[in-house]
Amino acid sequence: MTACVSPPAPLVTPKIQLQTDALSRTYPSGDGQITALRSFSHTFAGGMTSVVGPSGSGKSTLLNLLAGFDTPSGGAVRVGDTDIHSLSEAGRADFRLKHYGFVFQSHNLVAILSAQENVEFPLMLAGVPPRERRERARALLAQVGLEGRTHHLPSHLSGGEAQRVAIARALVSDPAVLLADEPTGNLDTRSGEVILELLTRPAREGKTVVLITHDPDVAALADHHLRVRDGEVTVER
């Protein structure tokens, strides 16, 4: 995919930093163990960071650890002053709801909810009053160019439109961290360009966007670059 996205605006200093400290993950295997991620220390200094590497290299392991979906064998993940892995499972879920947004290769929209209801869903879980969540959802859908599709079910949206709904849902809680796993993988070139344009906006606004991709053209759009191979993470300039 050759991406034609507008040149980035200057980065805004992030309000909350995402940091890893000697982060590692091993899994038992027969009589030994497999190291999926080796001691990784890094500060994600806002903007967009691409994570590239071959299949099975440890990219998904890193993303799951950053999100608190998986438990590290050692080290820490901090968002601001909070070590997310020191929280209980319920505490991590609540923390993610307030501070994280997620965009996956498959949009993962709830099939029986409209576009607007899907965007409202995280706000409903957070206890935001109905009127406020409706207003915020409509505003985000307008920002992603879907103000005329608010009442459509996911089955009545194109792949690109559904992914735009997913981005609106990811941003509606104003998260500090946005994690995106191959968000353009299932899309045609033009739809992919639209999605990348939308992902660069929060990066310019001081949010930390971590983007997993296999596409070098997509990775080149990021401000910072990480490469993962055999569990080793290197920072590329």
For the regions a protein language model found, what residue spans apply to each?
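ABC family nucleotide-binding domain
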Residues: 17-228
